[in-house]
């Protein structure tokens, strides 16, 4: 008989993980068809990320990208002279990212694993998340914050984009409560956040900027969708 006794907090987290849709096979299937009409499949960086670099809000140094997917932001950062480590649990996404990096002749340390299994020796000057947070279930949110705090240097910056609550775009995330996730055992495509909730979640960080992402009409050399938040925080 399978032993399903819960002994530790980690056992509880893994049990809750198992009751939600498995993330790895979903994202492998998602990235397997590279011809799909998905805006962020284009090999272009987020407009807010470009603004951080151009305005020198973030100085060159060591960068960790969480949920890098096919690598578009990691490649941009490497091209700008950053030392980039990029993590994603999808083998399909990482393979695509490696091919793109090779084509662009940039060096990036790619890691194919869950961000919650990450074990690296470095501390980072900048951590970036483009669309990972809103796919993380509430019971893992504290682990996510702990991960950022562990790997981000004091005075370092953390940037993200995520679904914005209140936007009616059909591609936006769901506005269910944290409890509702477990009533229905689903994130319903991803969780939308209000500005107030972002400020509360990251209350231990200094808020540098929270704004809607600028809509970038394609074709373009930057990605931008106005149903997303962009945020930049500084570790105190």
Model-identified regions with their sequence ranges:
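Conserved acidic residues
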Residues: 125
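Short catalytic micro-motifs in class I SAM-dependent methyltransferases
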Residues: 131-135
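Class I (Rossmann-like) S-adenosyl-L-methionine-dependent methyltransferase catalytic domain
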Residues: 1-120, 136-147, 151, 157-236
């Amino acid at each position: 008989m399978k032993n399903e006794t819960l002994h530790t907090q980690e056992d509880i987290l893994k049990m809750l993980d198992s009751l939600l849709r498995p993330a790895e096979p979903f994202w492998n299937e998602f990235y397997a068809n590279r011809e799909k009409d998905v805006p962020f499949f284009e090999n272009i960086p987020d407009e807010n990320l470009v603004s951080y670099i151009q305005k020198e809000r973030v100085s060159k140094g060591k960068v960790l990208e969480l949920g890098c997917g096919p690598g578009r932001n990691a490649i941009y950062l490497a091209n700008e002279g950053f030392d980039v480590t990029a993590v994603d649990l999808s083998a399909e996404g990482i393979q695509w990212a490696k091919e793109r990096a090779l084509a662009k002749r940039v060096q990036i340390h790619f890691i194919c694993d869950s961000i919650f299994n990450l074990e690296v020796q470095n501390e980072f000057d900048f951590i970036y998340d483009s669309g990972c947070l809103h796919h993380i279930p509430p019971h893992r949110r504290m682990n996510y914050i702990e991960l950022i705090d562990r790997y981000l240097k004091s005075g370092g910056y953390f940037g993200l984009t995520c679904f914005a609550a209140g936007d009616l775009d059909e591609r936006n995330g769901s506005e269910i409560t944290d409890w509702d996730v477990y009533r229905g055992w689903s994130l319903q495509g991803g969780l939308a956040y209000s500005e107030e909730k972002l400020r509360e979640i990251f209350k231990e960080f200094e808020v540098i900027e929270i704004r809607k992402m600028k809509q970038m009409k394609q074709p373009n050399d930057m990605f931008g969708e106005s149903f997303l938040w962009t945020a930049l925080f500084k570790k105190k």
